[in-house]
Curated annotation (Swiss-Prot):
Keywords: Repressor, Ribonucleoprotein, Ribosomal protein, RNA-binding, rRNA-binding, Translation regulation, tRNA-binding
Name of the gene: rplA
Listed Gene3D superfamilies: 3.30.190.20, 3.40.50.790
Annotated protein name in UniProt: Large ribosomal subunit protein uL1
Annotated GO CC locations: large ribosomal subunit
Single Gene Ontology BP annotation: regulation of translation
Length: 226
């Protein structure tokens, strides 16, 4: 705590660490203790009760978007490439883009590939994998249905996953957003996480939920989903 700034310590002192706040009060408090001068991102941290063999991973489109548009790169050839351009992909190509990325180019936010391109795209594993951008059927980024894939990404479809410690960290709003819209995003996200409960899990799935702003302290949120 001694390494934190005066403003953080003051904000921290206003949070009851032993209290479970309902989401409405948590959002109000988060905004009340805000001290940063920029529009902070609001994050959620969900601690899950998982076994080593459990995987929690999916994608979601939140009801209220807040992030800047993503630069979508699509690996495709022929008619599929033409489709990708028509549907609004930022970059479309095959070997030309593969070589460009190998040379260090990284001005894109998400990568989609048609199944027939994956053998070639696989050569970029060390590069794309490091950024968490390797196309994967589980995240709907390996597909022949480029229209749906691109449209959903334009609407803000984003991947979430639990790390090796069973923690999901995800951004779901901005401090400038209306409180009700922040709440709607929170509820939609938690609902989607609950759907990923492993079928063989015994006991509670969610251990705890916290929300915080970029510069602020964590606030423990009460929840009814198990």
């Amino acid at each position: 705590m001694s390494k934190k700034g005066k403003k953080y310590i003051e904000a921290f002192s206003k949070v009851d660490k032993n209290k479970f706040y309902n989401i409405e009060d948590a959002i109000l408090l988060l905004k009340e203790i805000k001290f940063a001068k920029f529009d902070e991102t609001i994050d959620i941290s969900i601690n899950l009760n998982l076994k080593k063999n459990h995987t929690v991973r999916d994608t979601i489109v939140l009801p209220n978007q807040f992030m800047k548009p993503k630069r979508i790169l699509v690996f495709a050839k022929g008619d599929r490439a033409d489709e990708a351009r028509a549907f609004g992909a930022t970059y479309v190509g095959d070997d030309d883009l593969i070589n460009k990325i190998k040379s260090g180019w990284d001005e894109f936010d998400v990568v989609v590939a048609t199944p027939d391109m994956m053998k070639d795209v696989g050569r970029l594993g060390p590069i794309l994998g490091k950024r968490g951008l390797m196309p994967n059927p589980k995240t709907q980024t390996v597909t022949n249905n480029l229209k749906d894939a691109i449209n959903s990404l334009k609407k803000g479809r984003t991947e979430f996953r639990a790390n090796k410690n069973g923690v999901i960290s995800f951004s779901f709003g901005k401090s400038s957003m209306d409180n009700e819209k922040i709440k709607e995003n929170y509820e939609e996200f938690v609902k989607e996480v609950v759907k990923k409960r492993p079928s063989d899990l015994k006991g509670a799935f969610i251990d705890s939920i916290y929300i915080s702003s970029t510069m602020g302290p964590s606030i423990k949120v009460n929840f009814v989903w198990r």
